[in-house]
Amino acid sequence: MSTISDIKLEDYWISPRLGFLSDQPVLTELPNPYYRCWEQMISSVLPTDGWVLIRRQIDQMPLLSTKKLHTEPEWRRAYTLLTTLAQVYIWGEANPSDKLPRSVAVPLREVSEHLRISPCASFASFCLWNVAPVPGVVPTDPDAYDPDNLHIINSFTGTKDEEWFFVISASIEATGGRIIARMLEAVEAVHHDRIHVVNEFLNELASCIAEICHLLERMYEKCNPSVFCHRLRRFFSGSKAKEDAGLPRGVFYEGTDGGGDWLQYCGGSNAQSSLIQLFDIILGVKQSGPGIRRACTSFHQEMRQYMPGPHRDFLAQMEKLSNVRSYVLSHPRHSNLHNSYDQAVAALALLRQKHMIVASRLPHPLAIMASTISG
């Protein structure tokens, strides 16, 4: 069995500086001209046109091989492009399409298999791999991932509201990501009974979550709920449980030989963020009530299928190794360690409350579940 000292963050596509965001620069376009038609399809059809011609144009696209993708940033860029094309094809016109043509469906399934992620839009395609510092900002600058220093590469609507929604999410990822290495140190410290290290970590975690709460409160600075609901939200939609939208069987992903598969997937959602689930894991947080607990566990496990495979692996590994809560409970109830732990759990509960307030104004069917958490 692996120990905490065996974990190398880079093996899980995790940056000590940015967490689940990549240290490798996000590509703004694929370097091989072979894939130019994918890039041109995104850039030539303006969001202000309402995507009215997008299906006809995608239907005419050639089927490209994925064998010319080499680096991980290239695979991620391809995934972002193809999921964007899939969303505008399915949801860009008045009536959703229950078919995804082979020119998108085949390479999307191949790219997703490589990345070990579901072949559909996700938090990774909208946020992790579609947000970067604005030109002129040095990526290693401590303030590079302040929301005002970020921009999105591809957009569904071309609005500042959409961009702000995603850059806030990316800034939250970067803020929380900086504490992941400290989590590993705290888990290791438990084995050596270094109580001061665990206590310091819990205090840092509470401060980190408080900073994330502040970022979440900034959502309304430049994201108008009306724009979000009426122009952007449909592009987050999935193909699962969409009978009312005219997709009773989901979406048919065409294959290379004239066949294909009916597939159903959830839409893109911040519930697919590995960071928030990691906070639960490190604190040993459970949702209160057996029925709620089972529902939340099932929901969280389902959301992991929309995370990059290495991120999902990291969460599974941390579930096996996390020992902070049991260590805290082995100490007196009124100790400083207990107080620090309680403050971290309270900070996480407050974050969920603030998120639910945001979700109520920017409603989406896959918003993070409201729940009472118990440490």
Curated annotation (Swiss-Prot):
GO biological-process terms attached to the record: 'de novo' NAD biosynthetic process from L-tryptophan; L-tryptophan catabolic process to kynurenine
* Broad class of enzyme this protein falls into: oxidoreductase
Tell me the pathway: Secondary metabolite biosynthesis
> Which Pfam families does its entry note?
IDO (PF01231)
Under catalytic activity, the entry for this protein gives:
D-tryptophan + O2 = N-formyl-D-kynurenine; L-tryptophan + O2 = N-formyl-L-kynurenine
| Enzyme nomenclature, EC number | 1.13.11.52
Whether Metal-binding counts among this entry's keywords is yes
InterPro entries, per this entry?
Answer: Indolamine_dOase, Trp/Indoleamine_2_3_dOase-like
Per the record, its GO cellular-component terms are: cytoplasm
A GO term, aspect molecular function: indoleamine 2,3-dioxygenase activity
Is-annotated flag, keyword Heme? Answer: yes
Q: Which UniProt keywords apply?
A: Dioxygenase, Heme, Iron, Metal-binding, Oxidoreductase
Q: Which domain of life is it from?
A: Eukaryota
Q: Where does heme bind?
A: 311
Cofactor(s) needed for function: heme
Job description of the protein:
Indoleamine 2,3-dioxygenase; part of the gene cluster that mediates the biosynthesis of terreazepine,. The first step of terreazepine biosynthesis is catalyzed by the indoleamine 2,3-dioxygenase tpzB which produces N-formyl-kynurenine through the catabolism of tryptophan. The two-module NRPS tpzA then utilizes anthranilate and kynurenine to assemble terreazepine. The first adenylation domain of tpzA (A1) loads anthranilate onto the T1 domain, while A2 loads kynurenine, generated through spontaneous nonenzymatic deformylation of the tzpB-supplied N-formyl-kynurenine.
Q: Could you say which protein family the record assigns here?
A: Belongs to the indoleamine 2,3-dioxygenase family.
| Protein name per Swiss-Prot or TrEMBL | Indoleamine 2,3-dioxygenase tpzB
